[in-house]
Amino acid sequence: MAKRALGLGQKNKEKKRKVDNSNSNNEPNRNSPAPGADQIQVEMDENADLDDELTQLKGLWNNYFHSDRESEYVLNGIIHECDRLLRQSDSDEKTKKLLNDEFYAIYALALSELTIFKTEQEGEDVSQYFDQALEWAEIGMEKTSKDSQLLQLAVSKIILQRIPLQFISKLTVDSKPEDVNLDLFEQLQRAKKCFNVEKDLELAYEVLQMFDDLLDMLENFGHGNNIDEGLDSDEEDEIEPVKLNKKHPLYRLQKAIPENYAWLKETMVKLFENIEETTLRRNVARTLGHLFLKAAEEPTSVFMQQYDDEDEEEETEDKEVPKEIKQAQKEALSHTRTALDYLEKAQVEDEPETWVEVAEAYIDLGNLHDYQSSEQEKAYKVAEDILKKANRASHGRFQDILDNLLAKDQD
């Protein structure tokens, strides 16, 4: 399986964010307009009301949300504009009516995003930004609707951004309960409870990606620089989770990893079923493919152990396969077939790497079938055909994978 791309939580730790020089060392003054805020370029929908201040704010947020998110300057501009509208609403009824759940969600999410930059500034306490972000989301629910799905989703995102940045990044395997001032397990439960997939599907997908990143961090907690650098899937198979003391702040979260992966898969499937937009649907399908391949790893390991045992012992003819091996094979095949279904839906016509992910899943499928069976040969042949096509389209970029498969066929 190809190397897993680092997600938001890990990118924040390993990637140096670019910070605008004019704002890098100074806390923004919320009682004055953002310096040069009127110079920020904002792309608006052609049907948008350009005189509507909330529409302008939404345009600014969407620009940031769909960018590479490397501008603290833009975030400060969003926060200053939110502050300005709040002050203006005290004396202007028209402005007051603009402050709906979208406004409060933008304010809360912008404050939460700001922590990405603040973690890089020595001595900066990000807890205040997360506290304010949650406070504005809660104020928004009080002012608009407690049932606002957007604000609930914002709360979920803020919590999932907070746990890694404020807490996990500072913890070690020897940390004590008093090292954190929140029950992180209960915080994650709250994030799950607040999550929903009916609206704001792009934001919902990002939240689930952050959930996935968090589980990955918990699995690899205590393995030092491996978390920062990212782990190849082959390396992940060899690394056992560090066993934490029962009083460790992450102990309950670590114990809940399997059930949380199950929740993630189930919830991601619901999200996929609600999406019609092509690009987002493909992205979610690709993530689901990887999640189901991951689910197949443990039963695959159990199934493949029989071949390792045969290398150590003399093979006996007609040796009966243990029941647990057969069950593991069945489970791994089920997960891998489901992964294949999603990865095929994630293919992009002019992106050969998406075809190769399908080919690699077919190789996994072949490995799970009985040795030299017709099912195994068929799976390998499909993988070979896809790899040859991808190799031609990419001028030999995937030759190594193809060579490895052909060598397997000759064994």
Curated annotation (Swiss-Prot):
Keyword Transcription attached: yes
Cited Pfam families: Nro1
GO CC list: nucleus
GO biological process, one term: positive regulation of SREBP signaling pathway
Main subcellular location: nucleus
Region listing for Disordered, in residue ranges: 1-38
UniProt keyword terms in alphabetical order: Nucleus, Transcription, Transcription regulation, Translation regulation
Regions of compositional bias (Low complexity) in chain numbering: 21-35
Subcellular location(s) of the protein: Nucleus
Keyword Transcription: yes
Record function comment: Required for correct translation termination and probably involved in regulation of hypoxic gene expression.
Family affiliation: Belongs to the ETT1 family.
Name this polypeptide is given: Enhancer of translation termination 1
Organism: Zygosaccharomyces rouxii (strain ATCC 2623 / CBS 732 / NBRC 1130 / NCYC 568 / NRRL Y-229)
Recorded name of the encoding gene: ETT1
